Amino acid sequence: MTTLTITRPDDWHVHLRDGEVLADTVRDISRYNGRALIMPNTVPPVTTTEMALAYRDRIQAHNQTEQFSPLMSLYLTDNTTADEVRKAKASGAVVAAKLYPAGATTNSDSGVTDVKKIYPVLQAMQEVGMLLLVHGEVTTHDVDIFDREKTFLDNVLAPIVQDFPDLKIVLEHITTSDAVVFVKNANENVAATITAHHLLYNRNHMLVGGIKPHFYCLPILKRNTHQLALISAATSGNKKFFLGTDSAPHAKGAKESACGCAGSYTAHAALELYAEVFEQAGKLENLEAFASHNGPDFYGLPRNQDTITLVKDAWPVPASMPFGGDIVVPIRAGENMEWKVK
């Protein structure tokens, strides 16, 4: 197959950052996506409806397309109120709230210290129909970084699913076979996003032959057996799994340092990267469901009405890309991509 036409895709998990870099990140995310769900872990975090609406306006100021719309999310803290959730839902612009366990990832220090503290908020979310997005890792120092996801599933997420059976939950950027099994076995209100880089790479790519800092992300890349489980889930056509890139840019110097930041930038070529995975798995026919159907269906939103076309046409990824007054090194920097969006 050398061409593939699919319903216009959406990205259900992306980091655009804030300030002058929006000119670059919005350009990349809006190139062919219909919608993107914008993560709220900016500095300061997006904790109120007013902040979410203001952030959306800053994003839209750089949107040069007609088809792209940013969808906003709230950052949950120990102090988030049920009233704020209702206000966010009523705004029509905020579609979800994000649970970051405190300290789990970039700019998560303001996150939730104990899930029980936000149970009234989760109850309100269940009542008004606002989705809960979850960064599924525990942050206690006694848990190995490669076991954080499994421990979170057992100790944190399972009780939430049991206590709030009607709350729609997205387990974001899953990285383990354990998460695949959890989502498959959970009720119909639990789904998951999967990134391109967790499908393409495992921890050997990051660590063998020298440390590759641009593969360092959170949740961290796992062993090959988990990677294969993710590929199987993503390409299966199962409606519980859909596209969320977790594209997370950092300036080159912040990645290539003695204490490098976590995050991989894929927004420049996300759909093309996914297409490679699906082609290698012999499941290109399921890319449309993963990229364009399952996400809006789970969110209760209409599918996009127009289409985009991928062609088998090699093109080089630049060694770096503009990032405000700095540069970002994208995934596949200096290499060729096999697919291209026309």
Curated annotation (Swiss-Prot):
Residues the record lists as binding Zn(2+) 2: 98, 135, 173
Stretches assigned to coiled coil: none
Pfam families, per the entry: Amidohydro_1
Enzyme class: hydrolase
GO biological process, one term: 'de novo' pyrimidine nucleobase biosynthetic process
Entry's EC annotation: 3.5.2.3
Description of how the protein assembles with itself and partners: Homodimer.
Protein name: Dihydroorotase
Origin species: Vibrio vulnificus (strain YJ016)
Gene symbol of the encoding locus: pyrC
